[in-house]
Amino acid sequence: FNEAEHVEQVIAQADVILVEPVMQPDYTKARDERKGETGLTPANYKITRELLTGKAKSDAILLHSLPRMDEIPTDVDITRWSRYWQEAFNGVVMRMALLALVLGAME
């Protein structure tokens, strides 16, 4: 565990990069109703394609619980580091299995 002022200071050491939104939007409102109330991620916490390409280990993985805001740009989605889509899919399967177990559909 490391604490740093800028992700750039520690990303080269990371095997797993877990990103979460700094500010949570009000999901009860449509985007056009929010009028910029979403809050922006400080630049020193954003994970960009350039940062990953220039500093991250080639075998590091990038996780995010989704939905994302501006902390990870969409051009990172197609890089070798992104694993958040698989993470989201696996989360659905795990929740289905837990519900089946709790409701007695399986032993």
Features from the language model and the residues they span:
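Rossmann-like adenosine-cofactor binding region
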Residues: 1-76
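Adenosine-phosphate binding glycine-rich loop
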Residues: 57-107
